[in-house]
Regions:
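Short runs within selected transmembrane alpha-helices of multi-pass transporters and secretion channels
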Residues: 1, 159-185, 189-209, 214-236, ...
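Helix-loop junctions and terminal segments of transmembrane helices
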Residues: 88-113
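Junctions where cytoplasmic loops transition into the N-terminal start of transmembrane alpha-helices
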Residues: 37, 41, 76-84, 117-133
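Short alpha-helical transmembrane segments in multi-pass integral membrane proteins
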Residues: 1-7, 14-26, 121-141, 147, ...
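Residue-level signature of transmembrane alpha-helical cores of multipass secondary-active transporters
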Residues: 33-49, 82-85, 89, 129, ...
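Transmembrane alpha-helical segments of multi-pass transport proteins
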Residues: 45, 248-310
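Alpha-helical transmembrane segments of multi-pass membrane transport and lipid-handling proteins
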Residues: 119-170, 203
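Helix-terminus/linker motif at the lipid-water interface of multi-pass membrane proteins
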Residues: 46-87, 108, 148-152, 270-278
Length: 310
């Protein structure tokens, strides 16, 4: 009896040890999986911050090699990084918020093998980003560039904004596609694409800026955003045969942008003519530019909500 009792106790102890070992093994496995996906994201953020620090040093230094004085080189960098880019990145607050919501949705669909749901999410997110990007591009060219130059009292803000406006669709779509790839456990791939884009920007700083000035850096920004967005798209196309919808994602946003801008211009001219006897208004004033932007966005949203993109 004593021996049986001792054996039972030993068996219980062995079971506890095995359970503890299996729990520790599972914990180790979970930690490895989390690290596998978290490290590329952390590396991506780290490299981005390191590049921004290096960029603050490289741009003025390369502009001095180009022939600008020290003061003009620093001033040019300040105009690009402190005035132009914040204007371009302002609408990305919408896409960044959307990408935060996309990641868990795509991750859930991927875990239960709902490919059709992932494809639907892809279509909807790209459609929204293309509408936002093309409309933003039109507004930057027509109004926001002039508004920024007026507010900052710096005419070159307008020129730089016009040059960089074309990256808006690629920049916003890239954010959503990167979030979707992260949700599909492709964090290492998105990190590699980001490093590729950063390498192009660094190469443009080193190779182009000493020869053609700040335009070389702008060209590097444009090329890197287009290339990284294209790489994200190609990867998703290989996985889900995600085909571009040219009509809904390019032609329709462009048409709606033209309609919205034209309608707001006509409406503002009518309002200006009616109120001219009370308060003189000019189409180049800050009030007029802000009114055009707000009215164009309002008209665009109204039309967008009435159009069926399925």
């Amino acid at each position: 009896y004593v021996n049986n009792k001792q054996n039972n106790k030993n068996n219980k102890n062995n079971k506890i040890i095995r359970n503890n070992n299996s729990c520790s093994a599972r914990k180790t496995s979970y930690i490895r999986v989390i690290a596998l996906y978290a490290l590329p994201l952390n590396l991506n953020s780290l490299l981005l911050h390191l590049f921004e620090s290096a960029e603050a040093i490289l741009i003025p230094a390369q502009l001095i090699i180009y022939g600008l004085s020290k003061e003009n080189a620093v001033s040019t960098y300040g105009i690009i990084s402190g005035m132009t880019l914040p204007l371009l990145l302002f609408p990305s607050a919408i896409t960044n918020s959307m990408s935060v919501m996309l990641l868990p949705k795509v991750s859930e669909d991927n875990s239960v093998q709902r490919s059709s749901s992932v494809i639907t999410t892809l279509h909807q997110s790209v459609n929204i980003c293309m509408h936002l990007g093309i409309m933003s591009c039109v507004l930057f060219i027509l109004y926001i560039g002039r508004l920024g130059a007026t507010l900052f009292h710096e005419p070159s803000v307008y020129n730089y904004t016009i040059m960089l406006a074309c990256i808006c669709p690629f920049l916003y779509v890239r954010t959503s596609l990167a979030s979707i790839l992260n949700g599909l456990n492709m964090t290492a791939r998105t990190c590699a694409y980001s490093i590729t884009g950063l390498a192009i920007r660094i190469a443009s700083l080193i190779l182009l800026v000493p020869g053609i000035g700040i335009s070389g850096y702008i060209y590097g920004l444009i090329i890197s955003n287009i290339l990284v967005c294209t790489l994200h798209y190609i990867k998703l196309y290989k996985m889900y045969h995600f085909k571009p919808d040219i009509i809904n994602n390019i032609i329709t946003p462009l048409s709606l942008s033209i309609i919205a801008v034209t309608s707001s211009n006509i409406a503002l001219r009518l309002i200006t003519s009616l109120l001219s006897c009370v308060t003189p208004l000019t189409l180049n004033s800050i009030f007029s530019l802000c009114a055009n932007i707000l009215l164009s966005c309002l008209i665009y949203i109204i039309i967008y909500s009435k159009v069926d993109f399925t």
